[in-house]
Amino acid sequence: MVTARDLFDFAGTFMEREFNGAERPWDVLGRIKAFLEEHLKPEIKGTVHPTAVVEPDVFLDEGVVVEPGAFIQGPTWIGKGSSVRQGAYIRGKTVVGAGCIVGHATEVKNAVFLDGAKAGHFAYVGDSILGKGVNLGAGTKLANFKLDAGNVILHADGQRIDTGLRKFGALLGNGVQTGCNSVTSPGCVVGPECWIYANTTVPNGIYEGHQILCSEGRRITSRRRR
């Protein structure tokens, strides 16, 4: 079974206890709200444009810039030097680390961005975790809800793993890069330093790190990065 340590470098972050206490890395998704309710102390240290909306129960650390037209619901915690760009929509239950970008027309809910993670343009990040240094190409969508509305079942090594979650987007390990208009199906666990090529739809499953994932017709092909 993949562990949080296989995917993320969370040492020294204030979320470390939550990751360490999770038997399975996706279990963190069900704990974000309670964690924020326990630890978040609302305060605005950064800069908020007059046309942006920042609701109560939000913490913005030093150097955070919220651009025109952005909308941030609580509970949300945003770390030092991060940017919430024009037209971004953060729907609460979100932790954004230091030096991150929530970009133009990007929607985020019940998610974690570890330090340096970027979703710069037209992305959807729902019920997902982005590891350190992850970069989502424009138009990347991390789908989080099955059409049949049942629990997300992970398919890995011939096993069916019931995650217990009706909504589960993707866990993208440290350094994952996605190409423009790529999509992950509900319940994707992608190991560190993978590349997902543009226009690729990645099926539900667990993928080892240091691979290239690309579509060939309706099939997904993976190969080791050189």
Where are each of the predicted segments found?
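ABC ATPase A-loop
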Residues: 59, 77, 95, 171, ...
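N-terminal short leaders/motifs
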Residues: 3-23, 57, 69, 75, ...
